[in-house]
Amino acid sequence: GWHDAGDYDLRVESQAGEAYILAMACENFGAYWDETSIDFEKRIVEIHQPDGKNDLLQQVENGALTVVAGWKALGRLYRGILCPTVRQYAHLGDASAHTDHVSGTADDRWVFTEDNPGRELQVAAWLAGISRVLKGHNDTLAADCLEIARELFKITRCDNNWILTTKVHAAVELYLATKEAGYRDFVLQQQDFICKNIRQTGWFIGRFDQAVGNVRFSKAIRKALPELQAMYQEYSSKTPYGVPHDRGNRSSGSWEPQHLGYNYCYLHAAYPDLFTPDYIFNAVQYLLGMHPGRNQAAFVTGVGAETMKAAYGVNRADWSY
């Protein structure tokens, strides 16, 4: 799994969610990059040493392994894997130095669980998507991801709109992974809900719409999409950058442009007549510092209008977070 920058927690949504995003980059764009050697068994990573394997798929593996291992150990998803003391949290240096690696001593990390159906179904959606791209790269892990996604979809209760939204997303990803009629029929049965909640469902429903080709369903979705189109137009008008930098989440000025731009890519791909590519370019240009204003620092290390000297990393001693 991955740590946040300057943070020593591993959250299940960070692990599965990031692995899913990278998986979708591979699936939709054929993204390939090989500049790193990664040996999971020996726990060795060497940068600038290609190993003949797609780095993106190896990163997908990295995220999936921690989620699958947690499931196999606990029989459920973990919520977070955290260092137990404030002193460890404020640690300067590599995370591996938190512990003496001897089981049972007080420096071991704690594993937290929770009863959160929405998050569990969200992870089910992500694992189903991950399973598709891991086929042929790590077939055992791909099968584990799909099996866990199926089980979570089957056993997780659904009693509010957010949970149902995540269940529909899980069904979409499971259908795309398996082509099984049960998942297809579940999504089709939720047509009215999907249309009423198009702001939340629109970004992921297009791939299903195209894959299934149900005329009645397609007409209903297209009728609902102008509401989502208007939402993005409203967001674009809120700042000189063409993207909102903040919708209440003040912990990072890059999350909203990334999240909304990523979702918009799927809307443009599925319905290009309704969603022009402009918003995608606005999001990318904002992240690269190519926008009005004095501060044109890029959010991505090494590229953009003005690149920051400090690399983005986890070690607080490097001031890299």
What are the residue ranges of the model-derived segments?
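Short, solvent-exposed loop/turn and secondary-structure capping segments
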Residues: G30-W33, Y78-L82, G136, A298-G302
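Carboxylate/His-rich catalytic cores and anion/metal-binding grooves
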Residues: D55-L82
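Acidic, glycine-anchored loop motifs typical of Ca2+
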Residues: K42-Q59, L141
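Sec/Tat-exported extracytoplasmic proteins
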Residues: L22-F29, A64, W71, L127, ...
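Aromatic (Trp/Tyr) and acidic
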Residues: G1-A16, A25, P50, C83-V133, ...
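General structural concept
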Residues: A19-C26, D39, I44
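Short, glycine/acidic-rich hinge or "gate" loops at secondary-structure transitions
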Residues: W33-K42, R76-G80, L141-D144
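Beta-propeller domains
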Residues: C145-T178, F186, Q190-F193, I198
